[in-house]
């Protein structure tokens, strides 16, 4: 364990020099061993689930223990048994990483819970035995909503992590209590002005131009279909404003003069005719819309298979993996464009040039000034996008899915 700690610190030092950050997963759940070792930290009978996606159109029953609200904090405000357990869990997750993704943040504010003893043989459960914790009456002191601002946020700051940079995943169903705490920064009437979160922008069908607020955006995750499947003939993207060729071309290649107007028109036609170009443009638009984007491994490698069908018990869930020759496969995909793998330098170059073009179109800078500011960056991006397309040894294999 001592060697592991030393290695983690050395890895962090190397990444710091390279400007690279790792994001660890903070899973809001506990093991049976945690329950056995800390009986007072958890509620009896109650378990964490999800309001939708279960059997017979009911909730998902995850069988995850629920922290006891009564032992989160002592009377003097210090951490109680379950509060200490949670803080230690967050601390362990932060060891060796520079940021975290909270899965799911609802579980740290207002989890959806159910009585395990009330679950029927067919998996169904009465509405009276399941709800968001805030509606059950088992937390009269409102301790659970305090977790976010009194345990999670302070712990992040102790590790020099800006809460606004954390990736938060919700369940797609947000309770009023959650919205007050997360977006309003409210706990028992007090407003934490500097800790209001902005969340993630699920941008699959949205325009990113002029978007304000979200720190992260994404097209797909491990819980839904990869973007490669969106390119199929008849897909909804071909009739969606967020994927409209004229919008994407105008936003990414502003026609600020005759020469650029011609290039923008050609780009627009390519987006219209070529599904791969349309996806490439949509990815570049994400880089223009928010400071950060979230990318699933399936999208990065252009895989058209779904990693996990969210809300379903599927025998193939979580089994998709890369082949042992994935680096060659990736380079081959970029070289031949037979799979919509993401060429990051190329996408960033489009986004940077878009920003340059927009500043010129708005008369914020002259063309020579705007291009001079990014000349070094665009030159390097131009170089590396081509390097990634260079031929690799002929060892191409399909992605494995079992």
Model-derived features: positions:
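Intrinsic-disorder/low-complexity coil detector
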Residues: 38, 213, 274, 339, ...
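Long, low-complexity, intrinsically disordered segments
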Residues: 393-402
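Structured C-terminal cap/extension of enzyme domains
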Residues: 302-379, 384-390
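Conserved, well-ordered alpha-helix/loop/beta-strand core segments that scaffold catalytic motifs
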Residues: 8-27
């Amino acid at each position: 364990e001592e060697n592991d700690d030393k290695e983690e610190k050395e890895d962090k030092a190397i990444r710091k020099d390279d400007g690279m950050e790792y994001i660890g997963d903070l899973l809001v759940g506990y093991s049976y061993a945690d329950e056995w070792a800390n009986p007072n930290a958890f509620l009896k009978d109650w378990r964490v689930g999800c309001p939708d996606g279960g059997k017979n159109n009911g909730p998902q029953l995850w069988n995850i223990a629920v922290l006891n609200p009564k032992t989160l904090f002592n009377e003097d405000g210090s951490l109680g048994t379950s509060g200490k357990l949670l803080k230690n869990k967050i601390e362990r997750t932060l060891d060796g990483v520079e940021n975290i993704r909270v899965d799911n943040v609802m579980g740290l504010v207002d989890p959806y819970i159910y009585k395990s003893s009330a679950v029927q043989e067919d998996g169904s459960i009465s509405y009276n035995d399941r709800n968001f914790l805030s509606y059950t009456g088992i937390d009269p002191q409102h301790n659970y909503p305090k977790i976010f601002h009194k345990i999670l946020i302070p712990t992040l700051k102790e590790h020099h992590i800006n809460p606004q940079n954390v990736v938060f995943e919700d369940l797609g169903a947000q309770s009023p209590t959650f919205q007050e705490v997360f977006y309003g920064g409210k706990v028992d009437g007090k407003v934490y002005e500097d800790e209001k979160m902005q969340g993630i922008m699920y941008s699959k069908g949205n325009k990113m131009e002029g978007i304000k607020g979200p720190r992260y955006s994404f097209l797909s995750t491990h819980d839904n279909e990869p973007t490669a499947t969106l390119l199929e003939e008849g897909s909804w993207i071909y009739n969606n404003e967020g994927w409209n060729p004229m919008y994407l071309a105008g936003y990414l290649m502003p026609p600020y003069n005759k020469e650029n107007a011609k290039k923008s028109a050609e780009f627009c036609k390519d987006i219209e005719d070529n599904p791969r170009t349309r996806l490439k443009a949509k990815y570049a638009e994400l880089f223009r819309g928010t400071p950060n984007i979230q990318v699933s491994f399936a999208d990065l490698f252009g895989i058209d298979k779904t990693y996990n069908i969210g809300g379903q018990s599927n025998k193939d869930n979580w089994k998709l993996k890369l082949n042992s020759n994935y680096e060659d496969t990736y380079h081959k995909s970029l070289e031949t464009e037979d799979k919509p793998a993401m060429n990051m330098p190329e996408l960033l170059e489009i986004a940077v040039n878009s920003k340059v073009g927009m500043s010129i179109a708005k008369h914020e800078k002259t063309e020579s000034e705007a291009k001079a500011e990014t000349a070094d960056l665009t030159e390097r991006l131009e170089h590396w996008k081509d390097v990634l397309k260079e031929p690799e040894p002929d060892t191409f294999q399909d992605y494995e899915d079992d």
